[in-house]
């Protein structure tokens, strides 16, 4: 009986020690439409973030690239779902259906949604996504009073307890906490 107790104590000690070790930082993964997570990746090792926000049919600032660099430097392991396509071809058969369904699926599956409204943009799809996911508990919204519907965003976020930040850096700081 005493041997069993010693064995159990040693086993528990090893488990506790292994949990306390610093885990090696894995590269931040960025997944776009028409891409999948590599098969050899343990999805449980990563937290996922959907990058919702201004794209303006590709003419908007590529803020998603800056976000990827910030997450690469941040502690933790991250997979970013980025809906921006480098070569968007709306004439491709069923492309719009694919894109919308890809976005909705990844919005639902993500651990966090980082939503960025750029000043000077209209971002109608992002406003739609705000309405769809305001109650999800996953949203972190970046919006300044330079966005033409700032008050709508601010009021909606306040109603549902969604934090609003003035910068991507501030929002990411809260996500990685």
Indicate residue ranges for each PLM-predicted region.
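Bacterial N-terminal signal peptides that target proteins for export
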Residues: 1-7
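Bacterial N-terminal signal peptides
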Residues: 8-15
């Amino acid at each position: 009986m005493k041997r069993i107790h010693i064995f159990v104590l040693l086993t528990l000690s090893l488990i506790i020690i292994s949990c306390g070790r610093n885990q090696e930082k894995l590269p931040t993964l960025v997944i776009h439409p028409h891409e999948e997570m590599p098969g050899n990746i343990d999805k449980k090792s990563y937290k996922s973030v959907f990058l919702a926000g201004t794209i303006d049919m590709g003419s908007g600032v590529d803020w998603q690239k800056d976000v990827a660099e910030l997450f690469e430097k941040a502690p933790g392991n991250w997979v970013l779902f980025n809906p921006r396509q480098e070569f968007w071809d709306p004439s491709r058969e069923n492309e719009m259906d694919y894109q919308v369904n890809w976005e909705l699926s990844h919005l639902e599956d993500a651990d966090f949604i980082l939503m960025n409204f750029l000043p000077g943009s209209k971002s109608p799809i992002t406003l739609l996504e705000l309405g769809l996911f305001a109650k999800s508990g996953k949203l972190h919204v970046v919006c300044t009073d330079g966005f033409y519907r700032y008050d709508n965003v601010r009021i909606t976020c306040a109603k549902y307890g969604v934090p609003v930040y003035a910068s991507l850096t501030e929002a990411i700081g809260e996500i990685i906490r």
